[in-house]
């Protein structure tokens, strides 16, 4: 039976591990290193270099050396963060045929999944060299806050690399698995994962082989690359003051600056001062120029103070969602190379009120956890159960543009949730299901993941057809959505594709905006619900008047019509209380219509009375509480649901 390898596909470095007996072993690459730079280069002769060889020649081949590709995975080219990234890297980021952000090297275009696949192939070859056999299956890790598009793109990268991806596992969860496998007893742990490009924090409960994620939060555009960029900017600004030349405009100099910034950052974790010395960094008419700048630890900490502070809010949110206090956390696990920075350790200690656990290697622990999960899936590791969560809420757009959640964030996966919706127009034969991901109350404020049509619904009055919408999230965090007409059994489904996924910036923006606009969202939702209630009441009352108005008398009919006109006059306004008041007035008036109908029933008797009673059902506006009015676009007609 072939081995399942565990791969930590990182922004800056990647790592591969495999189970040997009861223990996971990190495998050294051909260069004798336990981690491999996540870099790919294309040389002038057409050769492709991956890992350390690519990093070694980066300075002399800046435009064809690709790094930090993980930050582009699942992102659209028009994303503002993509535009920002274009100014930070010496290689070219271009628009792919599907509108995604791709990269260009030696006149050829590559998708981020392709470039990631080159790195995965290197890890696969490393494992095969050690094991002496072919490897076809892997567990690959992703940041916990990765969206559906990014997870799908990572799985695609595995397929391109010739690997069957048995599971996509969240990085903090993998780290917890590696930490807690041999631990006895129960406890609550926090995993603080600050890597090269992303930040995650997860709270887990561990006990008797069960690893249950209680909550996760993060920032998918915060990591070592941002710290490097701050140092690069500082060095470039200092050089410009001295020499009047902006090194950021020179791609060759930019690559040398990046290399020097990363080296200085690492050195300042163990020393208080370092010297950045780059001879012949550039030249002008007067001759060659050299860069020589001293950088202290305190200066570095000042440069990145806000970046470090940005990790605190997700920690607060994760604790709140998990329902625990910082003092109730038994252990804090540090993951990712950036956690070696003394300032980071200081902030973690200050927030959680305890020294973080330093017994795991932050560069290797994620790959080890992935290998353990591979062992679990193969049956080599017994009595281990992993329960992960989905990071963002999922739902559809319903009447008035409201975002109706079917699956809340931090729901344990795999999960399946169904809800029954109905039509917004009489005789509507088709509906459009629009799928969203986010935390805002209005669908338009969240990100649309995709949409699909359900056609062939038998014509019926609005609110009568029953359309069951089902969300299904698998153990990889990948989403399937289906819609089924319960009368005909007709069904349509969609697997959310990467091209419709969220960008890193969108997720970060959504959560932060949700917090800032919580009160505003609540008010807008209340207004929409009041309008929907009013609209439904007007519809049923007008229908009842049409059918039974002659039995109510001219005076009552006139009074009801007056109330309908008054409600219509305020319905499009923003005064919730006015809409509620006029709705209540119309309800009182329509109740009198019901009384008149009952009297007519008693007088008439027989079959005619029965028909009138059926009409009263319409007047009261009662319906199945489980049916939610939904906003659907009619596909093969002129009408649209409002």
Curated annotation (Swiss-Prot):
Keywords: ATP-binding, Chaperone, Nucleotide-binding, Phosphoprotein, Stress response. Transmembrane segments: none annotated. Induction: By stress conditions e.g. heat shock. The modification Phosphothreonine is found at residue 198. PROSITE patterns: HSP70_1 (PS00297), HSP70_2 (PS00329), HSP70_3 (PS01036). Residues 602-642 are annotated as: Disordered. GO terms for molecular function: ATP binding; ATP-dependent protein folding chaperone; unfolded protein binding. The keyword ATP-binding applies. This is Chaperone protein DnaK. Residues 603-613 have a biased composition (Low complexity). It comes from the Bacteria. InterPro entries: ATPase_NBD, Chaperone_DnaK, Heat_shock_70_CS, HSP70_C_sf, HSP70_peptide-bd_sf, Hsp_70_fam. Acts as a chaperone. Belongs to the heat shock protein 70 family. Pfam families: HSP70. NCBIfam families: PRK00290.1, PRK05183.1, prok_dnaK. It comes from Paramagnetospirillum magneticum (strain ATCC 700264 / AMB-1) (Magnetospirillum magneticum). Gene3D superfamilies: 1.20.1270.10, 3.30.420.40, Actin, Chain A, domain 4, Substrate Binding Domain Of DNAk, Chain A, domain 1. The keyword Phosphoprotein applies.
């Amino acid at each position: 039976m072939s081995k399942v390898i565990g791969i930590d596909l990182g922004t800056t470095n990647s790592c591969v591990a495999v189970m040997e007996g009861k223990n996971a072993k990190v495998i050294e690459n051909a260069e004798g290193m336990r981690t491999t730079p996540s870099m790919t280069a294309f040389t002038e002769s057409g050769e492709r270099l991956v890992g350390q060889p690519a990093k070694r020649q980066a300075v002399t081949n800046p435009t064809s050396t690709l790094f930090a590709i993980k930050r582009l995975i699942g992102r659209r080219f028009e994303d503002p963060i993509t535009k920002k990234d274009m100014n930070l890297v010496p290689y070219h980021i271009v628009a792919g045929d599907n509108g995604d952000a791709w990269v260009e090297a030696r006149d050829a275009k590559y998708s981020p999944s392709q470039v990631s696949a080159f790195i995965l192939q290197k890890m696969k070859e490393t494992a095969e060299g050690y094991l002496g056999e072919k490897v076809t299956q892997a567990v690959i890790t992703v940041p916990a806050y990765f969206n559906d598009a990014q997870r799908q793109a990572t799985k695609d990268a595995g397929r391109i690399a010739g690997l069957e991806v048995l599971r996509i596992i969240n990085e903090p969860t993998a780290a917890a698995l590696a930490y807690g496998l041999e631990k006895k007893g129960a406890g609550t742990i926090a995993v603080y994962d600050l890597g090269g490009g992303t930040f995650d924090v997860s709270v887990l409960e561990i006990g008797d082989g069960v690893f249950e994620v209680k909550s996760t939060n993060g920032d998918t555009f915060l990591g070592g690359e941002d710290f490097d960029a701050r140092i690069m900017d500082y060095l470039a600004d200092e050089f410009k003051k001295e020499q009047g030349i902006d090194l950021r405009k020179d791609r060759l100099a930019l690559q040398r600056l990046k290399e020097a910034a990363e080296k200085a950052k690492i050195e300042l974790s163990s020393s208080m001062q370092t010297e950045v010395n780059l001879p012949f960094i550039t030249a002008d008419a007067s001759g060659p120029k050299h860069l020589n700048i001293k950088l202290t630890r305190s200066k570095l900490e000042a440069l990145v103070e806000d970046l470090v502070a940005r990790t605190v809010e997700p920690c607060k949110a994760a604790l709140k969602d998990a329902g625990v206090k910082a003092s109730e956390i038994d252990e804090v696990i540090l993951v990712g190379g950036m956690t070696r920075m003394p300032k980071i350790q200081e902030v973690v200690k200050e927030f959680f009120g305890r020294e973080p656990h330093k017994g795991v290697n932050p560069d290797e622990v994620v790959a080890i956890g992935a290998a353990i999960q591979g062992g679990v899936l193969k049956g080599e590791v017994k009595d281990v159960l992993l329960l992960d969560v989905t990071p963002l809420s999922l739902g559809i757009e319903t009447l008035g543009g409201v975002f109706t959640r079917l699956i809340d964030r931090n729901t344990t996966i795999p999960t399946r949730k169904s809800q029954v919706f109905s039509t917004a127009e009489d005789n509507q034969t088709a509906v459009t299901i629009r799928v969203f991901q986010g935390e805002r109350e209005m669908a338009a404020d969240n990100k649309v993941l995709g949409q699909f049509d359900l056609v062939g619904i038998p014509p019926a009055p609005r609110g009568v057809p029953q359309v069951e919408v089902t969300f299904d999230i698998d153990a990889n965090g990948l989403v399937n959505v289906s819609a089924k007409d319960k009368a005909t059994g007709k069904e349509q489904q969609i697997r959310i594709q990467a091209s419709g996924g969220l960008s890193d910036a969108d997720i970060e923006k959504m959560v932060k905006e949700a917090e800032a606009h919580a009160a505003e969202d609540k008010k807008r939702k209340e207004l929409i619900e009041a309008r929907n209630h009013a609209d439904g009441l007007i519809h049923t009352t007008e229908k009842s008047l049409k059918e039974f108005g002659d039995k109510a008398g001219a005076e009552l009919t006139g009074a009801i019509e007056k109330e309908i006109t008054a409600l219509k006059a305020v319905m499009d306004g923003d005064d919730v209380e006015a809409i509620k008041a006029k709705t209540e007035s119309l309800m009182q008036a329509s109740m009198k219509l019901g009384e008149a109908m009952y009297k007519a029933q008693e007088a008439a008797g027989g079959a005619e009375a029965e028909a009138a009673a059926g009409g009263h059902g319409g007047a009261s506006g009662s319906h199945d509480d489980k049916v939610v009015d939904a906003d659907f676009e009619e596909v093969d007609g002129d009408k649209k649901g409002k």
